[in-house]
Amino acid sequence: LFCGLMLARKGYMPILLERGEDVDARTDRVARFWETGQLDPSSNVQFGEGGAGTFSDGKLNTLVKDTFGRNREVLRILTEFGGDPSILYVNKPHIGTDVLSRIVKSIRTEIEKLGGQVLFQSQVTDFVTEGEPGESRRIKALVVNGSQVLEAETVVLAIGHSARDTFETLLARGIPMEPKAFAVGLRVQHPQTLINESQYGMKECGELGPASYKLTWKASDERGVYSFCMCPGGYVVNASSEPGRLAVNGMSYHDRAGENANSAIIVTVTPEDFCGMETGAGTDQGCEAPGDAMAGIRFQRRLEETAFCLGKGNIPIQLYGDFKEGRVSEGFGGVNPAFRGGYAFANLRELFPESLSRAFMEGMEGFGTMIRGFDRPDAILAGIESRTSSPVRIPRDQGMESPVKGIFPCGEGAGYAGGITSAAMDGIKTAEEIIRRYSPLRPSRTVAKT
């Protein structure tokens, strides 16, 4: 989206192809999914206008080193289109799913006013290249929705971390990819007052806003265990995108007024783990380690299939004390559930190999020494958190280009970003390279900066 905006403002007329619906229709469809369990594989928490970030906490902080001002530019653009100006100066900027939805819509309108096009329910289903394998190949056209051929010499591949069918198509067409380490785990819910008291020394947060945390631990087997996408005053949501598979995520509104804090507690996994690792859904027998680009995706899918079965289509949940004992919970304790989507009690120990469960528990106990009560027995766990980052990387050179010329892998799905701000920064960087190479179709629009 940011790549398209930058190109449009510089006089280019980009065509944005979005497999899902516009943000308004998408929001309605996601709400129906949470209520009924009826999943649309093309328009859901992962796919549709704004991508996965639209249904998240809307965190805007990033660890990416930025010497070119792109981070500041992302925040400035967000305020230009409706974001609170405070995100320009607060330590941990946050925008919220409700505000981000409006901003995304406004950016799309701006792109269209400048001559760009945004086509919804338009999934790229194939890539047409010219040149023989092993020689200088380049993109020639895209196939949309299985039939429409769209000629293209320059394609920005910003597909997100969950476009598994697109990854499969890219691999089948000989576009290089490689497996990448990521992390998997469970969402944990605590009362927000517990986190406030630990961080502020008092249960009520006042003008400080609900407290957050960022925790890391090293397990006895040297695996990293850490909190991820912590959502103060938020909800755990069903974030599935494939039938028969289930994944969760965290989400907060702008006011972060929910009763609970939640975060993913995740354990690192590497390409060496993907092949032959036992999960509740069995072992992958078709893995071609160590360079099998799809191994991580198959690993994710096995975990998500197990989660779907454990919850019978609902989010499988368990109290932490029961997780340690390997028994199904019979009810809640002092933590009230805060979910979007149906949930059911299950034994989440059946999700993971024992090595990952052990590392998870070591991390939880360690975090209990940092935040008193973090490892309380009635903390609510939900699974599975499997979409923490892309399981693949699509190689690109210093000019942001794939070995297949004309394809520019970009953002989180390509393995070069991890969150809203870093993905937007990568989009801007990609646009800068395209602008450097090609002349615009119309005069550029200058935007006053503040």
Regions found by a protein language model. Name each.
Residues L1-T450:
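Residues forming the flavin
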